[in-house]
């Protein structure tokens, strides 16, 4: 029997980490990492597994030193902390195993700090490693010959995490994406053929999330709609489960913009209680989209703004991923992004400079052209050297755009254009259910008002900037004059907390004494 500790290192402050918003929500971290509870589920008895998420609790290195195996996972934004943890473990003589997105694309990054490295998916290689370890002959490197059969993936062991410390739950329906964006590592690691879990698997995981008292859940697929026919059948099962159980879960997900071209799919997503979707729009510059092979964003069916508006009209808020620094971008790109996001009524936009991830086609192309900065911490925040502007102009424009987008007036004007002027209806599924169950609807309204009041009170008392506190109060009052809806008010309160995080992040990016860190 092996005593195993699995660690998810602390993230550096990032856009999706919501570190500056979490205290107002009474939480330690935004989402639980998927790898840890899944690896625990893949570990057969009599092995014993302990999960440690450093984002919600400190690592007990004395405890780790007593373990037979300590596994560490992590993404690019966690790589520095991963290295620190591994160095401490090696100093204590611990056998270390490393996996996750970063080591999968940069296998030699940790050198001798890692006894065993897992490249890519590990549903088959983790159990194989444990058998090899028991026999005293673990390999240095493991990589699956074939992609994981998702119909055989077990439900993650959420019971081994302190789920109450997370703001949101997470669930994965599928892996893989059919498209071929040049900068994306997903198709490198997970392939272009979408692979889905069965409806029975997914419903089991949703039930586990409900049992852990999660209410808002991110469907963390990189493209939920990669196989539209299959996901429609899954969504119908999710809708039936929501109806049976009283719509206990609200979802946010990720999808490609061709979602806007499928009215049936949008309707099913809304009925399943998906209220927001993150879309990789990347750029309003069509030449940049062609350059990076983001061809799905150039298909017929209207402009990107028109497609975003169709998704919003269906009943889902759109969050955007935007990238600066493509070869076809000049210094006019910053204003083009600002105008696009305002016209599209997108308040939440993760904007970052183009970065070349190892093993991607972009990385190989830029390396061949001598346009990669190979330093661990590039001076201008990204390893990709732009073509039509200087690196200084790109980094200055990026920081300036972040400051502009998250200036309170600009952010809330975009938000109000959607929720007030646009009157988006993101609560359709629950409202229809509530008409059939009026007592549940009344209790929900009371709960939502109380949650909204609590969050807004914490924001307007604790935010150190007095002008910002006044702005939050003013905007909420204006919303309630127009739409006295507790669900919309709760979303608005959460979006206010998210704004505080993004604004604080933007201000720190602009601080002259801080190193420039690209948005993740």
Region locations from a protein language model:
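Radical SAM enzyme core and accessory elements
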Residues: 2-6, 48-51, 133, 379-520
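Acidic, low-complexity intrinsically disordered segments
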Residues: 2-213
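Conserved beta-strand positions
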Residues: 6, 72, 119, 219-221, ...
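Flexible glycine/acidic-rich beta-alpha junction loops that bind and position SAM and/or redox cofactors
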Residues: 11-17, 106-108, 179, 228-229, ...
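Amphipathic alpha-helical segments that form well-ordered structural scaffolds
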Residues: 38-42, 310, 400
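Structural recognition of alpha->loop->beta junctions
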Residues: 109-128, 268-276, 338-351
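Acidic/polar loop patches that form or flank catalytic/metal-binding clefts of enzymes
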Residues: 139-142, 250, 319, 347-352, ...
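Radical SAM [4Fe-4S] cluster-binding motif and immediate context
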Residues: 154-319, 324-326, 330-339, 367
């Amino acid at each position: 029997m092996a005593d195993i500790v699995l660690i998810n290192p602390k993230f550096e402050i990032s856009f999706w980490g919501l570190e500056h918003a979490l205290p107002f929500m009474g939480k330690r971290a935004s989402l639980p990492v998927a790898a840890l509870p899944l690896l625990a589920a893949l570990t057969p008895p009599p092995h014993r597994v302990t999960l440690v998420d450093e984002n919600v609790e400190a690592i007990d290195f004395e405890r780790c030193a007593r373990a037979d195996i300590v596994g560490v996972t992590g993404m690019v934004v966690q790589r520095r902390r991963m290295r620190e943890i591994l160095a401490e473990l090696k100093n204590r003589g611990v056998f270390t195993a490393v996996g996750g997105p970063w080591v999968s694309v940069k296998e030699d990054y940790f050198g001798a700090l890692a006894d065993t490295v897992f490249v890519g998916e590990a549903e088959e290689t983790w159990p194989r490693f444990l058998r090899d370890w028991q026999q005293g002959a673990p390999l240095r490197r493991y990589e699956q010959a074939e992609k994981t059969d998702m119909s055989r993936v077990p439900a993650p062991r959420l019971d081994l995490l302190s789920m109450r410390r997370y703001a949101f739950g997470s669930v994965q329906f599928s892996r893989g994406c059919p498209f071929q964006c040049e900068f994306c590592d997903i198709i490198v690691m997970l392939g272009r053929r979408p692979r889905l879990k069965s409806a029975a698997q997914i419903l089991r995981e949703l039930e586990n999330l409900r049992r852990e008292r999660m209410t808002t859940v991110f469907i963390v697929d990189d493209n939920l709609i990669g196989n539209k026919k299959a996901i429609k059948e899954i969504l119908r099962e999710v809708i039936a489960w929501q109806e049976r159980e009283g719509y206990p879960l609200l979802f946010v997900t990720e999808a490609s913009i061709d979602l806007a071209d499928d009215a049936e799919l949008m309707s099913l997503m809304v009925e399943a209680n998906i209220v927001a979707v993150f879309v990789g729009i990347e750029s309003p510059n069509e030449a940049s989209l062609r350059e990076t092979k983001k061809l799905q964003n150039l298909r017929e069916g209207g402009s990107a703004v028109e497609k975003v508006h169709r998704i919003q009209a269906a009943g889902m808020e759109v969050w955007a991923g935007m990238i600066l620094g493509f070869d076809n971008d000049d210094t006019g790109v910053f204003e083009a992004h600002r105008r696009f996001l305002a016209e599209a009524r997108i308040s939440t936009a993760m904007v970052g400079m183009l970065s070349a991830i190892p093993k991607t086609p972009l990385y190989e192309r830029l390396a061949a052209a001598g346009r990669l900065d190979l330093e661990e911490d590039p001076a201008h925040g990204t390893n990709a050297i732009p073509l039509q502007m200087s690196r200084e102009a790109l980094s200055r424009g990026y920081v300036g755009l972040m400051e502009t987008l998250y200036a309170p007036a600009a952010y809330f004007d975009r938000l109000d254009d959607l929720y007030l002027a646009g009157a988006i209806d993101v609560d359709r599924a629950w409202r229809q259910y509530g008409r059939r169950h009026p007592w549940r609807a009344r209790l929900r309204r009371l709960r939502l008002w109380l949650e909204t009041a609590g969050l807004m009170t914490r924001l307007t008392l604790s935010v150190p900037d007095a002008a910002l506190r006044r702005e939050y109060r003013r905007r909420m009052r204006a919303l309630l004059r127009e739409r006295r809806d507790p669900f919309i008010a709760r979303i608005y309160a959460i979006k206010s907390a998210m704004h505080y995080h993004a604004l604080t992040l933007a201000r720190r990016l602009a601080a002259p004494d801080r190193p420039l860190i690209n948005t993740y």
